[in-house]
Structure formats: C-alpha cells, structure tokens
C-alpha cells in the first residue's frame, strides 16, 4: 500500500532529526547551531511535534514554558498556508555525483514545506553560465535563490539585484573564505547566510593528517579538479599552509568532469614512481586516487602499504576504496544538509516576512576511516547511494580482494 504524503513527511522528519543529532561532536555542534538559528523550531513545526500517527495538538501555554496557547483549530505539524514558492538552486557542476544527496535534501525539504525547486547552473564550473541562470531566475520571479559562490565578485550584482527584487539569496557549498590569505582581499556577495563547509579550515585539518601519515622530505601530490574556484581552492590553500617546507609538493589539475579526473591521476602516478602521498580536494579526484591505487594493487600506509592517500566526500567508490584499503581517509561535509538547510532557511525567511536571518552553518569536516566507516556502508539517501528514506544494508559492505 502506497504511503500518504503525511506519512512520507513523518518519515523524513524522523530521519532529518536523527541525521543532525548523532552523537559525535561535530553533529552536536550543528544541532546547537540549528537550534540557536531557529531552524529546529521550524523543522519541528513543519514536521509535526509528535512523530506519531497523524498530527497532535500543540501544547498548552504556561508561564513556565513560555509557549503561547494555540489558536482554535490549530494543529501542530501543519505548514502555515502560503503560496507554492519556487526556490532555484544555482550549481557549478550540476551533474557531479557529489550533489545527488544535495538534490535529495532539496526534494525532501520542498515536500515537507510545500515548495517547488529548480536545479540549474553549469556542468563545468563556468561562472558566466551560473550568473546568467541566476539572472534568469530573478527575471522569472523566483521566490528564493541558493547559489554556490565559486568566484569573487561575479555574484555580487545578481545577488544584490535579487535582494532588491525581494528575493532572498543564500550561499551553499561554496563562499569566499576571507580567512584564506589568497582570498583576503575579496569579499562575499551580500547573501543572507552560508550553509556548507568551512573550506580553508578544513584544508588545515587535512594538512595535519598528511603530516601524520607521510615522512618529511617525501614527494606529495595534491589533486584538484578546477584550480582557482572558491569551492575547492581554499582547501588546497589550507593544506599547503600546513605542509609547506615538509615535502616536495606537486599540485595537479584533474578537470571538472569526473570522467577526466582519473586519467589525469593515472598519468601523474605513472610518471612519478617516488610519490609517497596522493591527496585530493574534490569528490571526483578522491575517487580517482583510490581507483588508481586499486588498479595497481597498492594498499595505503594505514593498511600496510607504501603510499598515503585521502580526500573529500563519499562517492560509493570512495567508500569501497576505504573499506578495501586503497584510501586512508575521506572527509564528510554532509551534502544532503547543503540542500535541505538552504531550502529551509529560505522558507523561514519567506514565512517570517524577512525576520529569520542571517544564518551561517558549518556542515562539518568529519574524517572517515576504516575504523568509523560502518554507518556509511548502508545504502543511504543522505549520502546519495539510495533513494530510500531509511538506510539499508548492502551486499558490498565487506572487503573485496586486491
């Protein structure tokens, strides 16, 4: 029997609250930030207070609780009546598999909040295409816009134009990190908040991990899909700020398309037999590093091998490469929340008549290794490996040979 829309909403609600309130420190901090920003209250109001069958009435107000009594006929869990708002997400690599869970997050938030969305932008980090799509969204009367700010200055005017037209704009996944000396002379567009990873700081944490894995004086390769774009360049800047002077460092551009990245890594590997560390700052390059080592049958140092390797994000091949010993680690930045939370932030801004902002949420830099990979072996909508709302076990969770 097919589930009703309300049953699906309740299922999403339970999963989202669980997703942001798991017990590790970064997620507890995220939950605290959400609560301070008014987001959890909005989630609970939209999801339903009681997570039981059907809706439950709102609690009666009292001087101790500070909760006002509900209006007659009000049912907790109902979204306040509003037009069907359209939210446009402008992305820099629209077909990249990293953003599959991001799109699921947008879909789920729109289902819960009775909104529509459009996913558009560039497939190859082309800023002009992104700006054109943003201007089109403004002219076509979008109710809210979320944009990955991958380049200084380019998004200033369209962001201000949107705000002038009464359209809220939030940044997600990428912003201009002024804590990175390479970007300190720039500024961010006048968006209302940013939801995503703290990019430069994440790179510095990554650099410390390299120091622990690779002997000083060795050759280290840093792979980056698109040098100079603000979604990943700050990571490599952060890494280099920590490891410079310790290694011979090769920075290798791999290209915006996942299909090209592994070829670039293979070419580098074949011409540098002395390399002792291979690290990537984007999802496709990370997958490529693990795949190249797998093809050559070379395990990483934490698995008894000779080369250290790691990167970012949780593509299915990356997860399996960690399990099988061809990557030492990867970093989870929770792409699902980078879709869900901007949608919710725009909704709260609109429903509150501009009261709920600014909102800045760091979605984290959680190191995933063989010792804590187990939860990620489940097929999960929240990591992009399934469409199901409840994570389920898979048949590929055990180590394979090679």
Swiss-Prot record:
It is found in: Cell membrane. It is a single-pass membrane protein. One of its GO terms (molecular function) is carbohydrate binding. Keywords: Cell membrane, Membrane, Sugar transport, Transmembrane, Transmembrane helix, Transport. Pfam families: Peripla_BP_4. Disruption phenotype: Deletion of the gene results in a growth defect on D-xylose and L-arabinose. The complex is composed of two ATP-binding proteins (XylG), two transmembrane proteins (XylH) and a solute-binding protein (XylF). Part of the ABC transporter complex XylFGH involved in the uptake of xylose and arabinose. Belongs to the bacterial solute-binding protein 2 family. This is Xylose/arabinose-binding protein XylF. It comes from Sulfolobus acidocaldarius (strain ATCC 33909 / DSM 639 / JCM 8929 / NBRC 15157 / NCIMB 11770).
């Amino acid at each position: 029997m097919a589930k009703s829309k309300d049953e699906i909403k309740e299922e999403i609600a339970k999963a989202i609250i669980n997703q942001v309130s798991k017990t590790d420190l970064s997620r507890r901090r995220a939950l605290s930030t959400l609560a301070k920003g008014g987001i959890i209250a909005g989630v609970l109001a939209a999801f339903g207070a009681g997570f039981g069958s059907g809706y439950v009435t709102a609690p009666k107000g009292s001087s101790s609780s500070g909760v006002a009594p509900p209006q007659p006929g009000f049912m907790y869990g109902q979204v306040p009546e509003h037009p069907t708002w359209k939210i446009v997400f402008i992305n820099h690599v629209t077909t990249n598999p990293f953003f599959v869970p991001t799109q699921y997050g947008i879909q789920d938030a729109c289902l819960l909040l009775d909104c529509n969305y459009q996913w558009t932008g560039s497939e190859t980090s082309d800023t002009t295409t992104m700006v054109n799509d943003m201007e089109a969204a403004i002219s076509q009367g979008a109710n809210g816009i979320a944009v990955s700010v991958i380049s200084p200055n380019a998004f200033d005017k369209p962001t201000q134009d949107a705000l002038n037209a009464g359209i809220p704009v939030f940044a997600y996944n990428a912003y201009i990190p002024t804590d990175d000396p390479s970007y300190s002379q720039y500024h961010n567009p006048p968006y209302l908040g940013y939801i995503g990873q703290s990019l430069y700081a994440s790179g510095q944490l990554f650099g410390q991990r390299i120091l622990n894995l690779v002997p000083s004086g060795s050759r280290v390769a840093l792979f980056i899909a698109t040098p100079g774009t603000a979604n990943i360049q700050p990571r490599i800047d952060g890494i280099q700020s920590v490891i410079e002077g310790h290694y011979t460092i090769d920075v290798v551009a791999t290209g915006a398309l996942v299909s090209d990245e592994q070829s670039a890594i293979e070419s580098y590997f074949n011409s540098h037999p002395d390399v002792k560390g291979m690290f990537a700052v984007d999802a496709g390059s990370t997958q490529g590093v693990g795949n190249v080592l797998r093809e050559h049958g070379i395990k990483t140092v934490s698995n008894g091998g000779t080369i250290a390797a790691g990167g970012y994000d949780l593509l299915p091949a990356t997860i399996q490469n960690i399990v099988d010993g061809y990557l030492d680690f990867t970093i989870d930045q929770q792409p699902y929340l980078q879709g869900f939370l901007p949608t919710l932030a725009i909704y709260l801004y609109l429903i509150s008549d501009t009261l709920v902002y600014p909102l800045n949420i760091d979605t984290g830099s959680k190191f995933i290794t063989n010792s804590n990979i187990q939860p990620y072996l489940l097929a999960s909508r929240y990591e992009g490996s399934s469409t199901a709302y409840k994570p389920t076990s898979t048949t590929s969770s055990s180590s394979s040979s090679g």
